[in-house]
Amino acid sequence: YIGPTFQQAKDIMWNMLKELLHGTDLIETTHENTATMKLVNGRRISLKGSDRPDTLRGVGLAYVVLDEYASMKVEVWEQIIRPTLADVQGGALFIGTPAGKNHFYDLYLAAEKDEDWESFQYTSTDNPLIDPKEVEVARRTMSTQAFRQEFEASFVSFTGGIFKNEWIKYDDEEPEDGNFVIAVDPAGYESVE
């Protein structure tokens, strides 16, 4: 399991792993400092951080979870993890919140077209554990782009501008001849596709 940093990986997954495996006969040893478990079948479960990519080299892997992949450097997958999985034809699961149209977006699109891969998209708005009222409060108080990215798992080009799209009003009728003032928002830029 790889998170953006070792501490994040440990904070997110370590206690959950210990709870899931507690009381089973699967664990041979547990090492708190390195967040590693050795299983009775000889396999290891280790938590790592992608912020120190060289610590990921030289370790045999059968399966890896890359959490918050959009926050990782693409080289972590392409130059370190992917080659390491090759000798055992290992697998990988990429999870996280989109962060614009970066390498996570590219991988998501490629996986939709490749029969050896699968793409999934789950939104917070569909999560039964999140109160719909909280979702509506977030929708009202966040920018459209931030809400779409954080709650709807949309690959939006988030610019962090201060104006919500729905606040902008316009008229379909062309104006008459005359002098006009045009306001420009220098707070952000979003590409139009």
Features from the language model and the residues they span:
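Walker B catalytic acidic pair
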Residues: 67-69, 186
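Inter-Walker segment of RecA-like/P-loop motor cores
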Residues: 7-62
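ATPase catalytic-site recognition across NTP-hydrolyzing enzymes
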Residues: 127-187
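ASCE P-loop NTPase helicase motor core
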Residues: 71-142
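Loop/turn-to-beta-strand initiation segments
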Residues: 44, 61-63, 88-94
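Conserved RecA-like ASCE P-loop NTPase motor core of nucleic-acid helicases/translocases
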Residues: 1-9, 122
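Catalytic acidic motif of RecA-like/P-loop NTPases
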Residues: 7, 70-71
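Short, flexible loop/turn motifs enriched in small residues
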Residues: 189-193
